[in-house]
Amino acid sequence: MITRRTCIAAAASSLALSATHLARGQAAFPNRTIRLVIPYGPGGIASVYAQLLCEGLTESLKQPVVIDYRAGAGGNIGVDSVAKSAPDGYSLVIVTNSILTINPLIYSKMPFDVNKDLEPVAMSIVYSNILVVPRDSPFNSIADIVAAAKANPGTLTHASTAVGSSAQLAGELFARQNGISMLHIPYKSATGARTDLIGGRISLMFTDPSAIPLIKEGRLKALAVSAARRSPSLPEVPTLAEQGLKDFNVETWFAISSPANTPKDIVQKLQAEITKVQSRDDFKAKLLVLGVEVAPDMRAAVVSQRMRDEQKMWAPIVRDLKITID
């Protein structure tokens, strides 16, 4: 005979069992290896930063955080692999402002939607691009470049590592704001571009901080940094704003993203741990050697805001240059 008391007892037992299964299914995050995708090949600033971050997070989270290189299509392949992963916090990706703001403007077919398929977790690092010229160049200031370009239209060249790269667009923005024209020369690598620049075959180039050793050695001459404030690695080099381009503020920045719909509590935990690691003095010091700084505001909301601002800045330039990659 089944009594009311029996039913209540059975129901209580069932609830307890369900709670046990639920607790097991929702084990504290993380309980296994986390994958951090770098959407570029090994080497460079992204690799150094990722290695430092993975070491710090592995220690902090008590679970391995490992690097997974997935290069191709200007970073789109690696980011897409994470965008299509399970939204559980175990697949993360380093995204750059080029991927988030320039790629959607120049690629005719994006495999993912930067606004819908990714969840910003934290801002990571920032660095200024550096306007460099050959050491024997007659240019010693922005005014020198502008005067030469206006006196001899069409003779100046600027290099970048690819059509549609942030370096190309920085050069185009520089030309527009100064009312001059320059011929863009795309290269397959930064090494190739810098070799020709050192040899005097190119007039100038916006490059990343990996060129700082060449500047320190006197093989290249730095005329300006592109951010709104001077670089602590090159404190003697003025900003473009200091030389008359008041609205020129171009930085390269990295952020960490997860697939869209990653649970908020997991995103918040990851953001807190990333912020903790990146706030350490030793972490900052190792990056500063490279000319790179930790983002002053690491909140996820900053990623979304900067995306919107930079898409508005680059859209008219990309449109006018008719840059399209199939």
Language-model segments: which ranges?
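N-terminal (or domain-start) structured segment
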Residues: 24-115, 155, 180-206, 214, ...
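An extracytoplasmic/periplasmic, membrane-proximal ligand-sensing/linker region
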Residues: 31-33, 177-178, 216, 264-326
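Hinge/capping helix and adjacent helix->loop/strand transition within the periplasmic-binding protein
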Residues: 84-90, 105-192, 240, 253-286
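Short coil/turn segments
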Residues: 42-43, 97-98, 126, 134-139, ...
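C-terminal lobe and pocket-closing loops
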Residues: 211-279, 309-312
